[in-house]
Each structure stands twice: as structure tokens, then as C-alpha cells.
Amino acid sequence: MHVALYGGSFDPPHNGHLALCLFAVELLRIDRLIISVSINPFKGRYGAADEQRKQMASLFAGELSRVGISAEVSGWELEKKQPSYTVDLIRYVRSVYPLDRLTLLIGEDSFREIRSWKSWEILPSLCDLAVFRRTSPEDHRENSSFPFSSGTVRLIDFDFPLSSTVIRERVAADMPVGDLLPSAIRHYIVKHGLYRKA
């Protein structure tokens, strides 16, 4: 079985996340997708509480399930109650799926900072890496800046210009976000009054 790990704060999950997951599952032939909710860097600044983000991630997984994608939400990082390291998360997932192929899905910006990660050198021995990069030519830099050989990492052109920050800002400004979010997540945000300025 091919298992993929997709982590983030998901504050909130949006259509860009959804599009990436749909694209990854089809392109990489992923059998199971794990959505890992990380510690929230925006806590106390209009960000949702940990449990709310986990619930929105569950709604997001439900959206994936509706189109036939097997998805589950992991709260392992949240349960640690402190910032965790990607290598530790991967080791945890590997312990749950010891015999399966494992791929880490990450964005290009995160990948270019990978040398600052704990034990980054051993990541290729634990999982495959799929790096989703912006498709505009001006955003592409020389592959020589990548810390691994070209055969270790799969580069995938993908561009969906949307961020959770934009959504939080639009909600705070009372601007519409209906076309940026799965409907279940939009309803959750409205119901719980998330991202509104005090």
C-alpha cells in the first residue's frame, strides 16, 4: 500500500489543500492519505484552537472520502503539546505502517528550508519525498540548491495561489470566502465564529 503524509496547521483547510491532495493521489497513485495537524503558529492571533483545527481537518478528510480517497486525520503532533519534528512524525507513521511505501508531501518553500530540519539527512531512508513547486518560471531556482540528489526527490509542478492566511484575513474583514473553502469547513467557521476580530 502507498501511504502519503500531508502535514500543516490547516487553519483552515482550503481548496488549495484539496486540489493538491486530489492531484497527488492521482499522480502518485496513493492508497491512503494521512492529514497531520501540527502545532498552530497563530494561536492567540485569530487562529482556531487545536481541537477546532483538528475538527476542520476531519471535515477536510470527509471531502476527500466523498470522492473515493481513503484519508485519516492524525493528531499525534497536537498530542505532544510542543513543536514536533518532521523526522519524528515520519518515524511515528512508519511505526503504524511498517511495511508500506511512505511519501511525504511538501511544498517547495518548505523543502528549500529542509537543511534546518532535525535529522534531515536521513529522511530519504524513511520515506519518499514529493515536492510541489510553483509553476511560474521565475519561481524556479537551480536544482543544485536542493540538498538531495535529483533521483531522491520527485518535483511536481503545482500552483494554486491560495493560503490560509488570506482566508483568515478575508473572514476578519467580513469578505466572502465561499469559493475558497469546502462548504462543510465554511459552515464550521461561520458556526463557531472563527477568525473574527474581537
UniProtKB/Swiss-Prot annotation:
GO terms for biological process: NAD biosynthetic process. CDD domains: NMNAT. It catalyses: nicotinate beta-D-ribonucleotide + ATP + H(+) = deamido-NAD(+) + diphosphate. Keywords: ATP-binding, NAD, Nucleotide-binding, Nucleotidyltransferase, Pyridine nucleotide biosynthesis, Transferase. SUPFAM superfamilies: Nucleotidylyl transferase. It is an enzyme of class 2 (transferase). The keyword Calcium does not apply. Its EC number is 2.7.7.18. Coiled coil: none annotated. Belongs to the NadD family. NCBIfam families: cyt_tran_rel, nicotinate (nicotinamide) nucleotide adenylyltransferase. This is Probable nicotinate-nucleotide adenylyltransferase. It comes from Chlorobium limicola (strain DSM 245 / NBRC 103803 / 6330).
